[in-house]
Design a protein with these regions (language model features):
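Catalytic cores of nucleic-acid endonucleases
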Residues: 20, 25, 40, 45-101
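Domain-level recognition of nuclease-like catalytic cores that cleave nucleotide substrates
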Residues: 80-150
Length: 150
């Protein structure tokens, strides 16, 4: 197997891990490649990057292009962090996506976000995948609601 093929497999594996986690966290098994995540009715494009060494600007440009191709105004890039499980991956929220999320945030839920890093080059917000899942779940507990199970 070529090195490029192995990289592609690693990227796909990381993508699957991210969506498996988001499916579990939000209790929605239909999220992923063809089904989009939504927040306050707005679709959110999530692009994953397993390569922790990839330059941030390159990742953001690629994620922005993918979102634009899908006519999505809110988008984020999820970057793997070497040595961390999937929940410790970094979610990069660009200023334009943050602005749109803020416009939709009538309940001021975004006030509950604690950035790992803010203003990394022109206002880029960085949170963990766990925090991003909490935001997408309106700060409700993550995972299946066991009180509903029989």
């Amino acid at each position: 197997m070529t090195r490029a093929t192995m990289r592609d497999i690693d990227e796909m594996d990381f993508n699957i891990q991210v969506w498996d986690y988001m499916n579990w966290a939000l209790g929605d098994r239909s999220l992923g490649f063809d089904r989009r995540l939504h927040w306050m009715g707005e679709p959110v494009n999530v692009t994953t990057f397993q390569n922790a060494g990839k330059p941030v600007l390159e990742m953001l440009d690629e994620a922005r292009t993918i979102a634009a191709d899908n006519d999505m105004r809110v988008w984020v890039a999820v970057q793997h962090v070497t040595g961390m499980d999937v929940t410790g991956s970094l979610v990069l929220i660009p200023p334009e996506a943050w602005t749109r999320l803020s416009q939709l945030d009538t309940n001021r839920e975004l006030d509950g976000i604690h950035f790992i890093q803010l203003a990394v080059g022109n206002g880029l917000g960085v949170v963990s995948l766990y925090q991003f899942a909490l935001l997408m779940n309106h700060f409700q507990p993550l995972g299946p609601d066991e009180s509903k199970e029989v």
